Structures are given as structure tokens and as C-alpha cells.
Swiss-Prot record:
DNA-binding region residue numbers: 40-59
Pfam family, one: GntR
Keyword field: DNA-binding, Transcription, Transcription regulation
Domain HTH gntR-type: 12-80
GO molecular function, one term: DNA binding
UniProt-listed Gene3D superfamilies: GntR ligand-binding domain-like (1.20.120.530), Winged helix-like DNA-binding domain superfamily/Winged helix DNA-binding domain (1.10.10.10)
Protein name according to UniProt: Uncharacterized HTH-type transcriptional regulator YieP
Single GO cellular component term: cytosol
């Protein structure tokens, strides 16, 4: 008898929850690379789900490069080099409280490689309208120094950085900012206390971009990223 739409949705939800649980165990090293996962029946009994839900969960992890199912062998955990850490779900599963500092360390390396280049491009190819909007965001950041609101600062700070990526007109850089939106938010939330952060360094980037000085924008961004707390 065919499953109803509601039953299919419930099954899909169960398979996603199972995929997350299995991914967490793999990320924590409970299932090490090279090992074979328990079979469908064992996993189904262990987590209280159907074999269909297990199969769907395995498909999800396979698509992320975490496992590789093989007939008569089983589902093998793949080396970490195969895992697609640019996958939004995998990134979310990885960024637990336990792994937070590890994720942020890797994230900051990516930022210092990419964000200065985004600033350079923003200065050289950004439109007058985009530069005006960047200046508007900067003005609000400056205003928050006098009347600080933590949540609003985080929102504006994120919008400021993401707008620079958009100004670069480079689809890969724009996608990076979009993909790592949740990481940016978590990171900015963790470093923001009760005051604005490095306002002068943000302003130096804006000044360089508005003046269409790509080299100065590049160096100003490096200064921001290498300064403490940012």
C-alpha cells in the first residue's frame, strides 16, 4: 500500500535526523574513516527507524562524501579529505559547541585568503550605488557606538561584510559569503560583547573602497582580520 504524503514527510524527517546522528558520530571519530557502519537492520533497531529511513540517511551522507556503500561489503566511512565541508548541512552538523573553536580557526583562514580580495574588487568594480550603500551601513555602525545595541550591531556588521562580497561581482566570492552566513553569525555573536568592534579599521576599508583604491582596501582588510577579536 502506497505511503501517504504525511507518512512520506515523516519518513523523510526520520532519515534526516538519523543522517545527522550518524554524521555527528563520524565527526566525533566514533566511526573512524575506513570502518564499516552497522548494517541496515542493526541501525534501524538501534535508532528505532525503518530500513527505508536508514537507506535514505546513508544516501544523504554518501552525497556529502562521508560514506561509500558497497554491495556485500557494507557502508564504509570515507577519509575526511572526501567530506564536502562546503555542504550547508554538514557545516551545521560540524559546528557544535564542542567543535566551535576548530571550525572558527579554519573559517578565519578562509576569510583572510578571500576577504581582502573581495575588498580589492569592491573598490575597483563596485558601483556608485553599492558604495553609497556601504557608506550607509558604515554610518549606522558608527551611530551604534553612541547608542549600542548588540543584536543590531551583529546584524549590521554581517550585512557590511556580505555587501562587500556582493560588490566584488565574483560569483564564487558571493557564494562563499552566502554559504558561510551561519558561521559568520555564530562568530560575530561570540566576539561581540557590549561595544562596537574595530570601528576605525572598518572605516579604513570603506574609505579605500569609496576612493576606488583596491590596494589600500586589500591592506585595510588584512589589518582588520589580523587585529585581535575580529
Amino acid at each position: 500500500m502506497p505511503l501517504s504524503a504525511q507518512q512520506l514527510a515523516a519518513q523523510k524527517n526520520l532519515s534526516y535526523v538519523l543522517a545527522e546522528k550518524l554524521a555527528q558520530r563520524i565527526l566525533k571519530g566514533e566511526y573512524e574513516p575506513g570502518t564499516i557502519l552497522p548494517g541496515e537492520i542493526e541501525l534501524g533497531e538501534q535508532f528505532g527507524v525503518s530500513r527505508t529511513a536508514v537507506r535514505e540517511a546513508v544516501k544523504t551522507l554518501t552525497a556529502k562524501g562521508m560514506v561509500l556503500p558497497r554491495p556485500r561489503i557494507g557502508t564504509r566511512v570515507m577519509p575526511q579529505s572526501n567530506w564536502n565541508f562546503l555542504d550547508q548541512e554538514l557545516l551545521t552538523w560540524w559546528m557544535t559547541e564542542e567543535n566551535f573553536h576548530q571550525v572558527i580557526d579554519h573559517f578565519l583562514v578562509m576569510r583572510i585568503c578571500l576577504e581582502p580580495q573581495a575588498c580589492l574588487l569592491a573598490a575597483t568594480v563596485g558601483t556608485a550605488e553599492q558604495k553609497a550603500h556601504l557608506n550607509t551601513l558604515m554610518a549606522e555602525m558608527a551611530a551604534l557606538k553612541e547608542n549600542f545595541r548588540r543584536e543590531r550591531w551583529i546584524e549590521v556588521d554581517m550585512a557590511w561584510h556580505e555587501h562587500i562580497y556582493e560588490m566584488s561581482a565574483n560569483p564564487f566570492l558571493t557564494s562563499f559569503a552566502s554559504l558561510f552566513h551561519s558561521v559568520y553569525h555564530t562568530y560575530f555573536t561570540s566576539i561581540t560583547s557590549d561595544t562596537v568592534i574595530k570601528l576605525d579599521l572598518h572605516q579604513a576599508i570603506v574609505d579605500a573602497i569609496i576612493q576606488s583604491d583596491g590596494d589600500a582596501a586589500f591592506k585595510a582588510c588584512q589589518a582588520l582580520l589580523r587585529s585581535p577579536d575580529k
